[in-house]
């Protein structure tokens, strides 16, 4: 049996080369504030993979995506075991664009802090009088650069995203930048409307895109998971305060409240985080998470 080693390890993912495809494995690691924590969140990788699959299927009419299969029987023998079953996705190879495509439908987090300071979010002027967690009149696109592990992503304007892409793809930067912006907004609008019907507000999220062998823009990475998004319960939503969430915010809040944490979470925080991820999965997909 051929052995495989990841050629790329991100904060929470491992990527294996499978010839004409990639196998992306979502681990149970969790990161916050650009650091990898010492705990693992049981079954987190499987929940994220199955949730991405759901959204990729749901949005393939808007933009093609990189997913080929989540069935380990379609993968080499090395992956056909408990370690990889459920948390692995075989994907098309893409040349990833170096832009994180962030879309915000509600004002919260760093966006809220910036708005309080100067009435803008990532340089975009917003109406006066907004309160924390308010729904924005229209979703806003706030791209950022992709940072290496240990470094912070940097917010950039749309115009700067054009410049970044133009340097790599002369004559095509403006077109690619517009395509990923327009796809980001379209994906968010469709999915946010659907999620609302299931009792979940998608406050914000991020997408990543790449180019296939023909230079077409394709959606890659993960999609609308609790790792890449802020999910709030619709029940009890009230603008003017921070909201409870189904995502990593629970972990972030604990780390902020315990600055001497040494990146180690107490067991009850781990259990609550798993429960939140599962609840979000089951509400959104309408299926029970089978661990």
Model-derived segments and their meaning:
Residues 33, 112-113, 214, 228-230:
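Intrinsically disordered, low-complexity acidic/polar segments
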Residues 1-148, 261-291:
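Active-site loop/lid in soluble adenylation, ligation, and acyl-transfer enzymes
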Residues 103, 202-223:
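Conserved metal-phosphate-binding beta-hairpin within the catalytic cores
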Residues 21, 96-98, 198-202, 214-217:
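Coil-to-beta-strand transition motifs
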Residues 117-175, 219, 223-284:
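Anionic ligand-binding catalytic core segments
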Residues 14-18, 200-203, 207:
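Hydrophobic/aromatic-rich, well-ordered segments within soluble, folded domains that form packed cores
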């Amino acid at each position: 049996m051929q052995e495989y080693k990841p050629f790329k390890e991100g904060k929470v993912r491992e990527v294996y080369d499978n010839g004409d495809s990639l196998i992306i494995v979502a681990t149970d690691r969790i990161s916050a504030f650009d650091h990898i924590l010492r705990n693992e969140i049981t079954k987190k990788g499987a929940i994220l993979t199955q949730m991405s699959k759901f959204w990729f299927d749901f949005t393939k009419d808007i933009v093609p995506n990189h997913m080929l299969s989540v069935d380990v029987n379609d993968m080499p023998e090395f992956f056909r075991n408990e370690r990889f079953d459920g948390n692995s996705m075989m994907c098309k190879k893409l040349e990833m664009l170096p832009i994180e495509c962030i879309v915000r439908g509600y004002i919260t987090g760093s966006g809220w802090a910036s708005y309080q300071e100067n009435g803008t979010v990532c340089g975009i002027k917003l109406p006066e009088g907004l309160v924390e967690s308010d729904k924005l009149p229209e979703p806003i696109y706030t791209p950022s650069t992709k940072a290496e592990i240990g470094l912070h992503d940097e917010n950039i304007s749309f115009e700067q995203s054009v410049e970044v892409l133009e340097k790599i793809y002369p004559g095509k930067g403006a077109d690619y930048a517009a395509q990923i912006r327009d796809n980001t907004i379209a994906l968010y609008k469709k999915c946010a409307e659907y999620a609302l019907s299931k009792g979940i507000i998608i406050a914000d999220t991020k997408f990543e895109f790449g180019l296939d062998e023909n230079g077409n823009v394709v959606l890659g990475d993960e999609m609308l998971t609790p790792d890449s998004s802020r999910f709030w319960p619709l029940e009890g939503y009230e603008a003017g305060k921070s909201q409870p969430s189904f995502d990593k915010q629970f972990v972030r809040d604990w780390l902020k409240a315990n600055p001497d944490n040494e990146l180690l979470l107490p067991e009850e925080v781990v259990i609550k985080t798993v429960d939140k991820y599962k609840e979000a999965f089951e509400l959104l997909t309408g299926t029970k998470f089978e661990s």
